[in-house]
Amino acid sequence: MLQIYNSLTRKKEFFKPDHPPQINIYVCGPTVYNHLHLGNTRPLIFFDTVKRYLEMLKFKVYYVVNITDIDDKIIETSLKNQVLEKDLANKYIKSFNNLLETLNIQTINFKPQATQYINSMILYIQTLLDQGFAYFTDQGIYFRVSKITDYGKLKKQDLSQLKQNVRKQLDPQKEFPGDFILWKKTSQGITYPSPWFAGRPGWHTECATMIEQLFKLPLDIHGGGTDLKFPHHENEIAQTHAHSHQKLANFFMHVERLDYQNQKMSKSLGNIIWCKDLLKQYNPCIIKFLILSTHYRKPINFSYDLMEQTQQKYKKITYFLTKNNFYLKVNHFFCQTLDQDIMQLFHQLMQDDFATHKVIDLMEQIIKRAHQTQILDKLSQFQNSLLLILNTLVIAIPFNKPTKKDLQTYFLWQDARKCRDFIQADILRKQLLDKGFI
């Protein structure tokens, strides 16, 4: 039975959706003021695999990834580049969708944009005001954190520490340093009319509102990068409790960071590996292979040496499938059966909190076992099992498949060897070697 590590309880728990076979998943997506870097892409690759596997288990998964298309960073970038916020956002939404297509991430059912829900956000905030969970200052409307008794539970955030680590540009009218903006009063950048004053919604309110608009609470799974635990997901939890008196999600899943040069990859640090640039050098499946080779709750320290090692592992699987498939073809052997022991182990690994790194190791073991036998039935089962696993991980291996001419070349080569026509045999052998068949 599937077990998932729940960030909220800090332990693995058996996963049971509220309304099987339906599963609802919401993952926080990009703020579209730039292209996505490799760290941004890691959760998207991982949750794509999560959905594929859940569907393999016959669940019906509705998977939403939001797009934050209005935000201070978008406004800052648009002013700097002298373009409209909408045009800037649309440019990077297109870049985001192109990246998803290139990486073959096709499982997202809906990608809501924050600007499509402004009216709903206004109504949401008004409810919080009416219930005493929000208050006005000269700078906007804030959420009153003190009214949430277990605020900080997701990351075990110490509120006394929060007082000490207050932002420099603190609104002096805030009741508590941890109170967060629901509606920002501003004249800079795009603003929206409201019953109170022109402004725009806070990021945490955007997601909380969209979740309630799109799903019946609680979510089965709420996901994102580990950096979103606090304050973003914590503030979503607080707002949902205040607004609807419900819990936001049964399971929280957080994907660890991706480091570069032993530092967290981030735009603010400038140590960015843009996915669009990496894709100019590597097959998209090698990038996915790299991401899935480390458990999602462990950080990845990216390096180009690591990329090269991953590429060699990918090639090893490609070579095996090319040769093994050819061997089965020339022996006129075909079956659709799987190796049940391998598949049982695969499911054990995936149902243990999606241990994709161990599944990668399992694939290497399949190849090792295949090299130790010439039994056609076993080789076919190994190949079928490996291909099914790769398909679940959404890693395509475009291995060479023999044509009729290739098969004829093989049999001519065998005949030349029997006739001791070594010159012709060498010519034919080279043709097969060049295609990776032998």
From Swiss-Prot:
GO terms for cellular component: cytosol. Belongs to the class-I aminoacyl-tRNA synthetase family. GO terms for biological process: cysteinyl-tRNA aminoacylation. Gene3D superfamilies: Cysteine-tRNA ligase, C-terminal anti-codon recognition domain, HUPs. GO terms for molecular function: ATP binding; cysteine-tRNA ligase activity; zinc ion binding. ATP binds at residue 267. Zn(2+) binds at residues 28, 207, 232, 236. A motif ('HIGH' region) lies at residues 30-40. The lineage of its organism: Bacteria, Bacillati, Mycoplasmatota, Mollicutes, Acholeplasmatales. Its EC number is 6.1.1.16. It is found in: Cytoplasm. Transmembrane segments: none annotated. Its main location: cytoplasm. InterPro entries: Cys-tRNA-ligase, Cys-tRNA/MSH_ligase, Rossmann-like_a/b/a_fold, tRNA-synt_1_cat_dom, tRNAsynth_Ia_anticodon-bd. This is Cysteine--tRNA ligase. It comes from the Bacteria. Binds 1 zinc ion per subunit. Its cofactor is Zn(2+). It comes from Aster yellows witches'-broom phytoplasma (strain AYWB). It is an enzyme of class 6 (ligase). Pfam families: tRNA-synt_1e. Monomer. Keywords: Aminoacyl-tRNA synthetase, ATP-binding, Cytoplasm, Ligase, Metal-binding, Nucleotide-binding, Protein biosynthesis, Zinc. The keyword Protein biosynthesis applies. It catalyses: tRNA(Cys) + L-cysteine + ATP = L-cysteinyl-tRNA(Cys) + AMP + diphosphate. A motif ('KMSKS' region) lies at residues 264-268.
